[in-house]
Every structure is written in structure tokens, then in C-alpha cells.
Amino acid sequence: MHRRNGDALSGAAPTLAEPAIRLLSPADSIADLTTLLHRAYARLGALGLNYTAVDQSPEVTRQRLGGGTCYVATLADRLVGTILVHPTYATNDCEYFTRPGVACIHQFAVEPGLQGGGVGRKLLARAEQWAREHGFHEAAMDTAEPATHLVEFYARLGYGAVGHVQWPGKVYRSVVLGKPLVA
């Protein structure tokens, strides 16, 4: 896609306005956040990957936010990205996420027309900063193993495979990725 004059969502990274990264606020719409997740994960859903964010309800979005810290990227007062960091993720399915000192990153999404423009890198950097500020020595996340473009993107940002997990109800195996956090 080509950037139309003044259209930040046309497919090119914004040049005049940079998205603001901030904490999710009580004034932010959970329905809008959920719709952003649906748009961002639609390509993955079309590949047959049943990520939770493909079709989760606003209630599920709200539940997933519980116990975590959510950052959003906004552009012209519109939500264009999000990331959720948990101090530790309580699960019986992935031992790595329960390790002391590991902050877990979930629900990471960027407006499709802005992907590749640095919004995701800024969100991820902010989540990692939060983890360092709160005494965590590593960040971890997972993604579908068949989503090789995502695995490669995270590898470029310093994340390496540390294991695998088969989440209940998912049609794919996830690769668990970890990154040491340097102060």
C-alpha cells in the first residue's frame, strides 16, 4: 500500500506523527482494544492459527488484562497497538512462564497498516523497561511455531527459543521465547 497524504493507517509507517506509548487507562474502551486485537490477529487466523486474540470477546480481553500491566500505542487518539506484561504467568502448561524473575508478555498487537513501522518495537521496549524496573531479569513470550515471520521478528529483537508448549485447544504448537534483560 502507498501512503496517502495524511492517512497514517494506509500501510506506511507514520512520518509526521509518532504514536504515543502509555498505560491503558480506565477511560480506554475494552471493546476498541478487542477490535484492535481482532484486526491485528486476522492474518494469523486466516492461516488457520486459532490464537485467542483472533476472536476473543471483550470479557476475555478484560480477564486477560487482570494481574498484568497493559501499554497501548495511540495515534490521533486511536488505539493502534497494545502489549500486556505479567509479573509471572501462573500456568500448569508452560513451566518457563512460572520461573522467578521472568516477566511474561502477551496480547501483543499492532494495527495491520502500521506493522513494520516501529510501533511494535516501541511497545516491546516499553514492556521490557517495565520488567527491568520491577526487578525481572528476563522477558518471555510464546507464539505459534508456524508463524515463522513472528519467530524471526522476535529473534531480531534478541528473543531465542527456550522451549515449546501445546496450549489446550490450540491447533498449533507454540515456541516459547526468552530474552535476558540487561539493566
Model-based region annotation:
Residues V72, R78-P87, C104, A109:
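Conserved beta-strand in the GNAT
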Residues F108-Q115, A144:
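A short, internal acetyl-CoA/4′-phosphopantetheine-binding micro-motif in the GNAT/acyltransferase core
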Residues K122-E138:
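Conserved acyl-CoA
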Residues T88-I105, Q115, H137, V171:
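A conserved beta-turn-beta hairpin within the catalytic core of GNAT-like acetyltransferases
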Residues A20-T35:
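A short beta-loop-alpha structural element at the N-terminal edge
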Residues T34, H38-Q63:
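Conserved GNAT-fold acetyl-CoA-binding loop/helix
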Residues A140-V151, W167-V171:
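Conserved beta-strand-loop-alpha-helix junction that forms the acyl-donor binding cleft
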Residues Y154-H164:
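Conserved acetyl-CoA-binding loop of GNAT-fold acetyltransferases
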